[in-house]
Design a protein with these regions (language model features):
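Extended boundary segments
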Residues: 1-17
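Residue-level signal for threonine
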Residues: 7, 24-26, 113
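Compact, glycine-rich, soluble single-domain proteins
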Residues: 12-89, 93-94, 98-106
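Ser/Thr/Pro-rich, acidic low-complexity intrinsically disordered regulatory segments
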Residues: 19, 106-125
Length: 125
């Protein structure tokens, strides 16, 4: 599954070939936040269940990123330490936050697909 899945909190998830899942925020979310000036990344090798794992600070607000599914964090995007603006410049690629190994891959597939996410945005419009 290389296509993106989405949460109602405007996070995107992409299942990678190695079974890990990459997480970032959607263009809709980064646009609402404005210019991101700081990203606090999660701890590696930490198993997380439904908890805050990252914090974003922007010129408009601070926002938490919660672990979208249960799993172990295996990688963080260290480039965001020096260049948090990557979240705004390229939220679907270079602006990713972390990767994790999910406890249950089926939970990834059960998240919103692109059409369902588009409907969510339209409803929040």
């Amino acid at each position: 599954m290389s296509e993106l899945r989405f949460t109602v909190e405007h996070e995107w998830l992409r299942l990678e070939a190695d079974g890990s899942v990459t997480v970032g925020i959607t263009p809709f979310a980064q646009n609402a936040l404005g210019d991101v000036v700081f990203v606090q990344l999660p701890e590696l090798a930490r198993h997380v269940r439904d908890a805050e794992v990252s914090v974003l600070e922007s010129v408009k607000a601070a926002s938490s990123i919660n672990m979208p599914l249960d799993g172990e964090i295996v990688e963080v995007n260290a480039a965001l330490d020096a260049a948090p603006e990557l979240v705004n410049q390229d939220p679907l690629a270079q602006g990713w936050f972390f990767r994790f190994i999910p406890d249950d891959l089926e939970q990834v597939r059960a998240l919103l697909d692109q059409p369902a996410y588009d409907n969510l945005i339209a409803a929040q419009g």
